[in-house]
């Protein structure tokens, strides 16, 4: 009998011990910032109605303890973060957010603590003027996040690896903030149910054999799947319109991702795929592909984006018959190998084609026109560059960094500063190229070009080679 009484007393006391202290927070009383400084793991912060802005709180509001932030019964608290700051920075594991209205101008929730739970929350971009680089929830290297019945407006979720650190060197990275993510569980361990993006379903699939995403989805996240098929989707006005990682094969056709804060269509760590007829307008990075292989972008377009079509750490892939207009960086390729650009166009960009430290690239039948900085920039990137048209650019082609080039049968027309700028390009060959209507110079040669050959090129202005080293053979 004594043992039974002891057990009853223990069970009665245990819930009291397990439940932490409850802090009442309100705009007229204690702030969240103050309560979070006082609380401990297991405590609860109940938020009264009203607006919690920079006049009351210190942003970002850092949550470094396993606490619950929830709306008080019948109340509708609004967390209104200023520009350039996250509303909430979740550092602790096991944080819960319930019934909150989070409005932001850069990031709603910056989450680097695992086991985050959000239920019944509203997350919205407060002002579309701050769309570029904005994100509803940045998930940086976290596991087992649970989202239920949350509504996103003008934003969505972005999934990534952990924040950059010294150990990130040599790994694929994302936007200078996070690693792409070397553990598939950063993407596949979550639970997302009953959520919407711009009033449309947020579609999440993980570790499935075959997935066909619905056309009416507001955001599409498919990770760790064997086959992903997406047709005629419109995921505009999200943070990341699509997140496709660790899939064996993806097919995306006739889909669009306009006005997205981070990426329109994002694929990483995929083993093969085709994006056909996809587009992005006024998106930060239009179509962004990283750390993948055997990817083809065909008949895709990007307009008025910060960056148009993006390859990073991509192998044995191609962009074919794509068009980019009015972007900062039209096509960006870096740190990949075995890639091809075929019949692609960059019109009225800053840099039309920007290739940085790529393995050997084939670029054929492409057009760069009206680019205000450079039509084609080859930074330490060996290339076979043939049959391309460079028209009305400030500099048509700039090549430097010691990589070998073969440039043949290209048209350089109307270059306002220089048609072809070469610096330290050894063992390269230039044949059958035509220069017309050059502004200041047709060709400028600087530095070492040992072993390079110049043969049967038609210049409208004399080649400027006063600063070139020895070993540049001019053959007629």
Give the role of each language-model region:
Residues 7-15:
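Bacterial N-terminal signal peptides
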Residues 27-36, 41-68, 74-84, 104, ...:
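N-terminal extracellular ligand-recognition/capping segment immediately after the signal peptide
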Residues 27-28, 49, 54-55, 64-110, ...:
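Right-handed parallel beta-helix/beta-spiral solenoid domain characteristic of secreted/periplasmic
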Residues 56-58, 74, 81-86, 90, ...:
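Short glycine/acidic-rich loop motifs that flank beta-strands on beta-rich extracellular proteins
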Residues 40, 64-66, 74, 83, ...:
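Parallel beta-helix/beta-solenoid
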Residues 19-35, 178-229:
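N-terminal capping/linker segments that flank leucine-rich repeat
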Residues 152-197, 427-476:
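Leucine-rich solenoid repeat scaffolds
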